Amino acid sequence: MTTAPLILLAAGGTGGHLFPAEALGVELMKRGLRVRLVTDSRALRYSGLFSKDLTDVVPSETVRGRSPWALARTGLMLAAGTAVALNLMRVLKPAAVVGFGGYPTLPPLIAARLRGIPTVIHDSNAVMGRANSFLSKRVNAIATSLPGVLDKKPSLAGKITTTGTPMRPAILAAAAVPFATPGLGDPLRVLVVGGSQGARVMSDIVPGAIERLEPALRQRLILTQQVRDEDMARVRGFYDRLEIKAELAPFFADLPARLASNHIIISRSGAGTVAELGAIGRPSILVPLPGAIDQDQFANAGVLADVGGAIRIVQPDFTPDRLAAELSALAAGPARLAAMATAARTVGRLDAAGRLADLVMRVARTGA
């Protein structure tokens, strides 16, 4: 009996990297292939397609500074991870290795390259991440979520396929739920999230914005907010004082369904979040994470803002007064909310997992 080919999926240990890997894994398994995940220890927090039996943890390290000590530590950890990954390649003999970004993908992709195993990288950002940028010249094929990501590197043009960001089954199910435009007196459902790791700025700014809303609008609100454990008592006490109907939690396992059931999403603008908002088609207020060297979240938010599907607010401008004004304007304009939902859908790609699976299978078969 012939064993089905194995595809190794390498991803950093956060949702933005892991969820597209999971979506591709589901599609490849439907096609009769085997899959395994190579990642770092953070990924073990996530439930999903990849059980511990299907996961290999490889040592890795993110660059945390430019000092000689920090660079040396990173180099040593990546070298150790590459040694472990080389042994994995020898034992598992994958048909191809697919990387989804993050420094933990460097050891398995480098090891695959050294052993002559076909390689693909996928990047969900509007600006390619540093790990993928390093790997881009060394892999067989590059998949991007958006066109034009590597326009400044014409030498790579022959490797690039625009596939979109693969969506998990839960997102595809949520995408089938139409946007329910609220009437002027109807409940207004607002979801506040800060990415897979939470965001303290949401706990610092959103409560003050809610307090500044007109009492009639506050009474309409049904608020769901991701709040870190250390901020929970403070935020809950604030909303209790205002008598706001609010559900607070540090993490929502059913986030896709919650995205679909809300009228306005307030969030960071990680690549995965932006792709999911486009796929599901929901109006959003996006606050890019500041301080990134390549400003990837600012560019990601622009993908939705430029078509009218989102409002982008840079963090220095993200104040209680500004947020209250934006929420008040959206609540007073149901037609605008409906138009934003429709606009957001124009950037969604529901067939991305299939398109990426086609590319991976071709590279595994031909090496090109």
Swiss-Prot record:
GO cellular component: plasma membrane
Annotated EC: 2.4.1.227
This protein's UniProt keywords: Cell cycle, Cell division, Cell inner membrane, Cell membrane, Cell shape, Cell wall biogenesis/degradation, Glycosyltransferase, Membrane, Peptidoglycan synthesis, Transferase
Binding site for UDP-N-acetyl-alpha-D-glucosamine: T14, G15, G16, N125, R168, S196, Q297
Alphabetical list of InterPro entries matching this protein: GlcNAc_MurG (IPR006009), Glyco_trans_28_C (IPR007235), GlycoTrans_28_N (IPR004276)
Compartments reported by the entry: Cell inner membrane
Enzymatic reactions: di-trans,octa-cis-undecaprenyl diphospho-N-acetyl-alpha-D-muramoyl-L-alanyl-D-glutamyl-meso-2,6-diaminopimeloyl-D-alanyl-D-alanine + UDP-N-acetyl-alpha-D-glucosamine = di-trans,octa-cis-undecaprenyl diphospho-[N-acetyl-alpha-D-glucosaminyl-(1->4)]-N-acetyl-alpha-D-muramoyl-L-alanyl-D-glutamyl-meso-2,6-diaminopimeloyl-D-alanyl-D-alanine + UDP + H(+)
UniProt pathway annotation: Cell wall biogenesis; peptidoglycan biosynthesis
Family to which the UniProt record says this protein belongs: Belongs to the glycosyltransferase 28 family. MurG subfamily.
Stated name of the protein: UDP-N-acetylglucosamine--N-acetylmuramyl-(pentapeptide) pyrophosphoryl-undecaprenol N-acetylglucosamine transferase
Native source species: Nitrobacter winogradskyi (strain ATCC 25391 / DSM 10237 / CIP 104748 / NCIMB 11846 / Nb-255)
Encoding gene, per UniProt annotation: murG
